[in-house]
A protein has these predicted regions:
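Membrane-embedded alpha-helical bundles of polytopic integral membrane proteins
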Residues: 2-212
Length: 213
């Protein structure tokens, strides 16, 4: 088990490193695929996906097509306002599906279908947007470093001094102390990363507090 996790972890790190260095349409395509998988799993977990085998419903079709269109616009040389218009169009389309097929779908499926688009694909696209910023090849690592250090610090602090449960029913092993330790640890490491690496590249002192936040 440990060996499998170690190997998979190394592979993921190498792939992440390669994609972040490459950037551009290759990174966007990879994020699009990951987003589609994540959204599909979210749809399954929230009941958007139909229970009938080998069948997909209209909400899934709108979501899948919408994500591909969203990423196509993301990499195209158009105003980023079109990304917002795409999301609004997807919401209206989902509402049309709900109204004209009523009562086939529940309102909660409609809400989950739209939230699934925002939760995975849209948030994932910020990796691409960050990477495409000036000096983005350095800045983008703050996303991963902050996430990794938050998990690591939260685990270590929770194991050492965690006594108060954060959400006993949802996640019984997480503690208040661990969650605070994760946030503080991630902020400190992100600040150090910005100060010692990104700061040297960009030569803008004001950038450090922005990155920490």
């Amino acid at each position: 088990m440990f060996r499998t996790r170690l190997i998979s972890g190394i592979v993921i790190v190498l792939l992440t490193l390669g994609l972040m260095m490459k950037g551009g349409i290759v990174l966007a395509a990879a994020l699009c695929v990951i987003s589609l998988i994540a959204m599909y799993e979210f749809y399954r977990a929230t009941g958007v996906t139909t229970q009938e085998p080998k069948k997909i419903n209209a909400f899934e079709v709108v979501g899948l097509i919408g994500v591909v269109v969203y990423y196509a616009i993301l990499v195209s040389p158009v105003n980023e306002l079109y990304l917002l218009l795409t999301l609004i169009t997807l919401l209206i389309t989902l509402m049309f599906v709900y109204v004209f097929t009523f009562p086939k779908y529940h309102a909660r499926q409609l809400m989950a279908a739209f939230y699934g688009i925002v939760y995975a694909p849209v948030l994932m696209s910020f990796i691409y947007l960050t990477r495409m910023l000036p000096h983005g090849e350095y800045i983008v690592w703050l996303i991963f470093i902050s996430s990794w250090m938050n998990d690591t610090c939260a685990y270590c602090v929770g194991v050492l001094i965690g006594k108060h449960k954060l959400a006993p029913k949802l996640s019984p092993h997480k503690s208040v102390e661990g969650s605070i330790g994760g946030v503080v640890g991630a902020a400190i490491v992100a600040g150090l990363f910005a100060f010692f690496l990104v700061e040297k590249v960009m030569q803008e002192q004001a950038i450090v507090p922005v990155f920490v936040l």
